[in-house]
Amino acid sequence: MSSNSLALKGRSDAYTQVDNFLHAYARGGDELVNGHPSYTVDQAAEQILREQASWQKAPGDSVLTLSYSFLTKPNDFFNTPWKYVSDIYSLGKFSAFSAQQQAQAKLSLQSWSDVTNIHFVDAGQGDQGDLTFGNFSSSVGGAAFAFLPDVPDALKGQSWYLINSSYSANVNPANGNYGRQTLTHEIGHTLGLSHPGDYNAGEGDPTYADATYAEDTRAYSVMSYWEEQNTGQDFKGAYSSAPLLDDIAAIQKLYGANLTTRTGDTVYGFNSNTERDFYSATSSSSKLVFSVWDAGGNDTLDFSGFSQNQKINLNEKALSDVGGLKGNVSIAAGVTVENAIGGSGSDLLIGNDVANVLKGGAGNDILYGGLGADQLWGGAGADTFVYGDIAESSAAAPDTLRDFVSGQDKIDLSGLDAFVNGGLVLQYVDAFAGKAGQAILSYDAASKAGSLAIDFSGDAHADFAINLIGQATQADIVV
């Protein structure tokens, strides 16, 4: 029996990195952020819906059906807007949506119907759609404007987009640019979503100081005016093309969650099978900005094509730092994503409460599976597998470290309360003898399988266990 023991050293840097990112972008509570109260996702959704405007489903229908069309000529509102809205005097010159605008508008509509129970039907050209689209040239309405569903029928469903010699962002909307973001934003208005705060383009000179709550930024809502940097994120010039975390929560409060969307095994990022441009990475320079809505299956965030150091968090309502951006990927409330794949940088991967598959890839990665019997691959490089609670790899449902390399990889137990606050000292033995803190390291050379088992309760049974493909030594265990 070995009598070697490892003395308490305090929480490691790897554990601290995990703990810090688990609490990064935290929301709610009583503290002010940037001088504003912090809202939870649910509070933000209620704020976005404060006007209580919505379309009504037909009696007995579980799905709202709305038609849409692209105007080919000015309608009555365009010709005499002052009859309907006193602060709009002239919209200038009308122009119909181009083929590019129409195609991108349809993608924006699709992104809304993916997350909620709305079915959009193409009514063709003209003004016969419930929702209509057109361009104007005067700057009186800002870059675009639209009407909530609580207005008179003469205005309901209309959205208008500025195109003139000094403003061209709406000419060529595309995934990740401001034109596509504008389409998704204005469609959100026509469906019942307001700005998160009481501001409008063309009404004074609003700034982030006018926000009602801290998370009123483009990191959380496509309906916001304010840059994501205000809340610590950075998209490096990219914009969301689809509803984000708070928008999804809001629209689902109005029309329900679409539980038919992506019910199979779905991959987001590289090797995406979503058939959605905003969920798909096509090169190492792709700038992803999205919030995952997924109704089932065994799903994966694949960021294997990026070389930057990434931080990936699989918990619902959490934000991740992906592809050199900060806080650019989130997971909507109620969504479970099972798996994550890192890139060639030194990544931090955080699992959730189900059985996750985490693959670090190249680089010196930190993997934290959380609860559930997780399958963890560190990949090439010196990797650290972090644990913060004995329940995260119980004897009944142990994690498996699939490619452990002794002398290079580490099993980090420094965050376990028994070591940090309980003063427990780890002692390696050949067999349990009823003393808390005893640990058994085993290895079978024929199968190349090893294990670590620890008795924390002193009942001569393992409370904590990890299976390994590879052999671990005492020097590989960090406490």
Swiss-Prot record:
GO molecular function, one term: calcium ion binding
Active site: E186
Residues that coordinate or bind Ca(2+) 4: N352, V354, N356, G369, L371, D374
Cofactor(s) the protein needs: Ca(2+); Zn(2+)
Residues annotated for Ca(2+) 1 binding in this entry: R262, G264, T266, D294, G296, D299
Subcellular location: Secreted
Variant or mutagenesis effect after changing I350Y: In strain: IFO 3455
One term under GO cellular component: extracellular space
Keyword Calcium attached: yes
Chain residues that bind Ca(2+) 3: G343, G345, D347, G360, A362, D365
Alphabetized PROSITE patterns for the sequence: HEMOLYSIN_CALCIUM (PS00330), ZINC_PROTEASE (PS00142)
Binding site residues for Ca(2+) 2: G297, D299, T336, E338
Ligand binding (Ca(2+) 6): G370, G372, D374, E392, D399
List of residues binding Zn(2+): H185, H189, H195
Binding site for Ca(2+) 7: G379, G381, D383, D409
Binding site for Ca(2+) 5: G361, G363, D365, G378, A380, D383
Entries under Gene3D superfamilies matching the protein: Collagenase (Catalytic Domain), Serralysin-like metalloprotease, C-terminal
Positions of the propeptide segment: 1-9
Protein name per the record: Serralysin
